[in-house]
């Protein structure tokens, strides 16, 4: 049976707490990105010294043609100003004045802006994980949404809130490419870097399901193709932005009927000999197993060794086995003809018996959970065992009764261990959530973290009610509204600091979005996916990384564009400053094909080999995108205007 709602919420809270504990690794990663950007700024300054001498007459002619195309859509006054400057107005002028001058920042004050940006990344992760997402969970419960629809709507908005607000700021405030760059960079990061990190550090080979990956990848590919078509002319109209939003509504409908579509997909692929992963990578399973449910259960148990609950109901309904008299009696007593108390008791007993059968079956596999041997297994009932035939023997001649007895003892010990683990986890959940400003944790490292996050904890403690706590549970709408405001504020501060850093170092806004902003907003999701992959749930890690990209492109870009062109200034266009974005989005499309093709060649398994390949491709994407934006291959960007 599926875990209850309380167990789901407890598991999600533990996952969020573990993400918070990975603060040090997140800071180290962002520091390395900042060091990379500093190196790029040095190369940028060296290149700009003799830029006009190196480009030659052909490059000057291309720049003039670029200016003529832009001036066609500007007023005469703006065109004259743009023509006289031969540069792009920096987005820094759309923000309040900085307390430091550009010279002060070049002398070292920019480090303070880097630290502030990193702190904003962490603040966004805390607000999203501990306040925004729990409030969305409460909303989904009140609306009685299915898991698929809730995941495609509210949960996607919760995980992609920083990217969405960054895009809103890029459209309405900076009027530049920082939002588009962040969405594109975050999308590539989610596909290549997250899958690469999960493959390298999961600690095990994780099997992937073809259905989730193909479903999200196909629709994601259509979304990227639509984005390429719409931004090819460097402007987006109102109907193009509306198409993106409508495509996401279609995606929600697909998720609503995901189960029916999945069944059709399984019926088409089942004839090819695929039972679990949707492809013929399970040929090593012996044909004599006849796709028995034991195979599925054992294969699933291989990745959930410590789980106290296994979803046996769906697997047994899909792959039924011959029932004994006692089993049939238990199943009859869970129907609506009996009182609720009896139904609950019989359902619990049936699940215990099915788990007993799973453990007993594992005793005959000689440690190989990939192969199941079809031997009729006795099921323990309340006062004894069911009817049995002559004593059966295992594959090594061991008497079956002895093995069953040993397996029963192991089951009892395992259940006791699981109960103890659950009690410990429940005790830990009492202390879950963000740090409180008035309770100092124990341990030096925890104290340092508490001191580092004290200003953030102090502000959030008095402004955002924690709906995870029973006394604030009914205030989830207040939590939703206040956390949304804080996400908007932190996103504004984050984009402001990153814009200052890019202007000081001479790096275009789109590059800052593709690298620094994309990494900063996606590192928490990367850590969460790694935790999920270590638990053996590779499908969830990969599906979440690709599914969130669908939201980023269709809603993260489509919604702000639609608001600007339909509500704020009807009939206007969203203009892109950088022609290089079309190349970056093209690389994004290529990364989807390469990733799915690589997973297929790797027999739908997530391992270190696949992880290294994905990380290598991510490095290639960064290098190519940065060199393109710096006009190394062809002219795509006007230089950024200086102070004077």
UniProtKB/Swiss-Prot annotation:
Intracellular or extracellular location(s): Cell membrane
Transmembrane intervals: 108-128, 154-174, 183-203, 211-231, 235-255, 485-505, 511-531, 550-570, 581-601, 616-636
Spans annotated as Disordered: 405-442
List of residues that carry Phosphoserine: 308
Catalytic activity: Ca(2+)(out) + K(+)(out) + 4 Na(+)(in) = Ca(2+)(in) + K(+)(in) + 4 Na(+)(out)
Residue ranges annotated as Cytoplasmic topological domain: 129-153, 204-210, 256-484, 532-549, 602-615
A GO term, aspect molecular function: symporter activity
Annotated protein name in UniProt: Sodium/potassium/calcium exchanger 3
Organism this protein belongs to: Homo sapiens
Name of the gene this protein is made from: SLC24A3
């Amino acid at each position: 049976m599926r875990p209850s709602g309380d167990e789901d919420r407890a598991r999600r809270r533990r996952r969020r707490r573990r993400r918070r504990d990975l603060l040090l690794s997140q800071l180290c990663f962002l520091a390395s990105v900042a060091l990379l950007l500093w190196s790029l700024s040095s190369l940028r300054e060296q290149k700009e010294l003799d830029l006009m001498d190196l480009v030659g007459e052909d490059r000057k002619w291309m720049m003039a043609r670029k200016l003529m195309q832009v001036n066609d859509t500007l007023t005469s006054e703006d065109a004259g100003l743009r023509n006289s400057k031969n540069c792009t107005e920096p987005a820094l002028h759309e923000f309040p004045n900085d307390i430091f001058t550009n010279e002060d920042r070049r002398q070292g004050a920019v480090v303070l802006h880097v630290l502030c940006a990193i702190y904003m990344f962490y603040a966004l992760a805390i607000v999203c994980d501990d306040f925004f997402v729990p409030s969305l969970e409460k909303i989904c419960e009140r609306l009685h949404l299915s898991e698929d629809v809730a995941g495609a709507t509210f949960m996607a908005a919760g995980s992609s809130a920083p990217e969405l607000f960054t895009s809103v700021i890029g459209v309405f405030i900076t009027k530049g490419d920082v939002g588009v760059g962040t969405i594109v960079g975050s999308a590539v990061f989610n596909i290549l870097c997250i899958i690469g990190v999960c493959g390298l550090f999961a600690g095990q080979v994780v099997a992937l399901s073809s259905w989730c990956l193909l479903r999200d990848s196909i629709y994601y590919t259509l979304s990227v193709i639509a984005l390429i078509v719409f931004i090819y002319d460097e402007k987006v109209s109102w109907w193009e932005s509306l198409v993106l939003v409508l495509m996401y509504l279609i995606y929600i409908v697909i998720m609503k009927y995901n189960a029916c579509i999945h069944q059709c997909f399984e019926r088409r692929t089942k004839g090819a000999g695929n039972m679990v992963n949707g492809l013929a990578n399970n040929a090593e399973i012996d044909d004599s197993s006849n796709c028995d449910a034991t195979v599925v259960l054992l294969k699933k148990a291989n990745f959930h060794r410590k789980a106290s609950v296994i979803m046996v109901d769906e697997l047994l309904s899909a792959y039924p086995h011959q029932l004994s008299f006692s089993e049939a009696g238990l199943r009859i007593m869970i129907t609506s003809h009996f009182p609720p108390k009896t139904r609950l008791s019989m359902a619990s007993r049936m699940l215990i018996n099915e788990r007993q059968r799973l453990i007993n079956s594992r005793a005959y596999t000689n440690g190989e959970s990939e192969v199941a041997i079809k031997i009729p297994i006795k099921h323990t009932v309340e006062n004894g065992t069911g009817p049995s035939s002559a004593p059966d023997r295992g594959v090594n001649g061991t008497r079956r009764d002895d093995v069953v007895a040993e397996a029963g003892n192991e089951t009892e010990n395992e259940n006791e261990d699981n109960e103890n683990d659950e009690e410990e986890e429940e005790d830990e959940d009492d202390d879950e959530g963000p740090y409180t400003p008035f309770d100092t944790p124990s341990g030096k490292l925890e104290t340092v973290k508490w001191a580092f996050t004290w200003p953030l904890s102090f502000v959030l403690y008095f402004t955002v009610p924690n709906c995870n706590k029973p006394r604030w549970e009914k205030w989830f709408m207040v939590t939703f509204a206040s956390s949304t405001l804080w996400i908007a504020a932190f996103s504004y501060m984050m984009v402001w600091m990153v814009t200052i850093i890019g202007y000081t170092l001479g790096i275009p806004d789109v590059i800052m979005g593709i690298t620094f902003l994309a990494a900063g907003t996606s590192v928490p999701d990367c850590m969460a996916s790694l935790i999920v992959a270590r638990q053996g749930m590779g499908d969830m890690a990969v599906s979440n990384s690709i599914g969130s990209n669908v939201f980023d492109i269709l809603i993260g870009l489509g919604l702000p564009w639609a608001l600007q062109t339909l509500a704020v200034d009807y009939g206007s266009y969203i203009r892109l400053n950088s022609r290089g974005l079309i190349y970056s989005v093209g690389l994004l499309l290529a990364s989807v094909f390469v990733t799915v093709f690589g997973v297929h060649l790797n027999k739908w398994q997530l391992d270190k080999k696949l992880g290294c390949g994905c990380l290598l491709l991510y490095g290639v994407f960064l290098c190519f995108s940065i060199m393109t934006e710096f006009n190394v291959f062809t002219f795509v960007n006007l230089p950024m205007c200086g102070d004077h």
